[in-house]
């Protein structure tokens, strides 16, 4: 699994997090509250402007009530799909 020249991992991660949040039916504000993060930072992640740390991914997953491994697998699949 390698990123092609046109791929931006931040954008893929952001789309996956945004999709998971949408699937959970919660707002950025609610996710921020539950995950202990700022809503603006979640917005930056979802727009592909910031790359979350592993700690942040775990916090987001806790707030989304999904396993981090599920999110990472979805990211991996999206990278492969776009390669």
Segments the model singles out, each with a brief description of its role:
Residues 15-34:
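Short basic helix-loop element that most often maps to the first helix and adjoining turn
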Residues 1-12:
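A detector for short, charged/polar N-terminal pre-domain segments
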Residues 17, 31-32, 42-45, 71:
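Conserved hydrophobic/aromatic packing and binding residues within compact polymer-binding modules
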Residues 2, 70-83:
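Short, charged recognition helix plus adjacent turn
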Residues 36-50:
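Recognition helix of helix-turn-helix/homeodomain-like DNA-binding domains
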Residues 17, 28, 39, 54-57:
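Helix-turn-helix DNA-binding elements, focusing on the entry/boundary residues of the two helices
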Residues 55-70:
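DNA major-groove recognition helix of helix-turn-helix/homeodomain DNA-binding modules
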